[in-house]
A protein has these predicted regions:
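Bacterial N-terminal signal peptides that target proteins for export
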Residues: 1-9
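Bacterial N-terminal signal peptides
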Residues: 8-16
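Flexible, polar/low-complexity N-terminal or interdomain linker segments that lie immediately upstream
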Residues: 20-113
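Mid-length scaffold segments of soluble, non-membrane domains
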Residues: 88-156
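Solvent-exposed loop/turn segments at secondary-structure junctions
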Residues: 107-111, 126-129, 164-168, 193-197
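Short, solvent-exposed loop/turn and secondary-structure capping segments
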Residues: 113-117, 134, 170-174, 200-201
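Catalytic cysteine-centered active loop of the rhodanese-like fold, especially the PTP/DSP P-loop
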Residues: 140-195
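Active-site neighborhoods of enzymes that stabilize oxyanions during catalysis
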Residues: 200-209
Length: 209
């Protein structure tokens, strides 16, 4: 009897260890990251429930093009394209030390449904030339026009994203910034956007504790 109990305990322990070994990690070496955002500690990790399926707008495979056309991997010379690991690294470095901003270029109603932790909502349309408040926005991004022309030497590094590879909002925002003289080396494009972020089960503002 004791032998049977011992075998049962061994099987239970091995099963439990196997379950722990199957945790959904960010990378093989990284299970989660902790980032201090505006004085609050936020943990970014992946959803551990392996039965989870998307059930939102992001389950669609097909949308009319235009306007929902597939975006290129590269938006413009000098503008880097990021994946999820680069976005996480950007949060850990530039956003955390105050030299960078993660920009959600979607409209406010989409931002309020959930975004990437640490993101600032700056709708793409606010960067267009006909917006009377655009100059104020550029100043908030670190630009200066005290000499009568724009000086972008002190701007934040920006990583911009929208709904996903089928969403043109970030492309429009980047184009508007480049047109006014924003340096391309200060711009990063997270092409996967919320579609890929959610697909990988990464923490959002709706799930961050």
């Amino acid at each position: 009897m004791k032998r049977h109990i011992g075998v049962a305990c061994l099987v239970t322990c091995v099963t439990a260890a196997s379950a722990l070994a199957q945790d959904v990690r960010i990378t093989q070496e990284l299970d989660k990251v902790s980032v201090n955002l505006n004085g609050a500690n936020v943990v970014i990790e992946r959803n551990q429930n392996q039965a989870t399926r998307l059930s939102s707008e992001f389950t669609k495979t097909s949308r009319p093009c235009p306007p929902f056309c597939i975006q290129p991997m590269s938006l413009a010379p000098g503008v880097q394209t990021f994946g999820e690991l680069e976005v996480i690294s950007f949060l850990q470095s530039e956003v955390q030390d105050g030299s960078g901003l993660l920009i959600d270029t979607r409209l406010p109603e989409w931002f309020e449904k959930g975004s990437i932790p640490g993101a600032v909502n700056l709708p793409f349309s606010t960067l267009e030339a006909d917006n009377p408040f655009r100059d104020e926005i550029l100043r908030a991004l670190g630009a200066s026009d005290s000499t009568g022309s724009w000086d972008f030497s002190g701007v934040f590094t920006l990583t911009l994203f929208c709904n996903g590879p089928w969403c043109a909002q970030t492309a429009i925002a980047v184009s508007a910034l480049l047109e006014v003289g924003f340096p391309p080396e200060k711009l990063n494009f997270y092409r996967g956007g919320m579609q890929n972020w959610l697909l990988l089960g990464l923490t959002t503002t709706n799930s961050a504790g």
